């Protein structure tokens, strides 16, 4: 889920990050972005 992606995907302060995006996609989101070193998932896909 969204929170597990935050825990697994440490990242730079801002911008896209591969692990973050991949984690979010597996969780059913369209992708993810890094905000203040945390992975934030985008809108859910296919719902």
Swiss-Prot record:
Domain of life: Eukaryota
Record text about domains: The presence of a 'disulfide through disulfide knot' structurally defines this protein as a knottin. Has the CSalpha/beta fold, which comprises one or two short alpha helices connected to anti-parallel beta-sheets stabilized by three or four disulfide bonds.
InterPro entries in alphabetical order: Ergtoxin, Scorpion_toxin-like_sf
Family, as annotated: Belongs to the ergtoxin family. Gamma-KTx 5 subfamily.
Subcellular location: Secreted
GO terms, molecular function: potassium channel inhibitor activity; toxin activity
Positions of disulphide bridges: 5-23, 11-34, 20-39, 24-41
Function: Reversibly blocks Kv11/ERG potassium channels.
Pfam family, one: Toxin_17
Keywords tagged on the record: Disulfide bond, Ion channel impairing toxin, Knottin, Neurotoxin, Potassium channel impairing toxin, Secreted, Toxin, Voltage-gated potassium channel impairing toxin
UniProt note on tissues of expression: Expressed by the venom gland.
Parts of the chain that traverse the membrane: none
UniProt-recorded name of the protein: Potassium channel toxin gamma-KTx 5.2
Any single GO CC term annotated in Swiss-Prot or TrEMBL for this entry: extracellular region
Listed PROSITE patterns: ERGTX
């Amino acid at each position: 889920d969204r929170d597990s992606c935050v825990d697994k995907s440490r990242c730079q302060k801002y911008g896209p990050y591969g692990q973050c995006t991949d984690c979010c996609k597996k969780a059913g989101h369209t992708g993810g972005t890094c905000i203040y070193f945390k992975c934030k998932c985008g809108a859910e896909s296919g719902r």
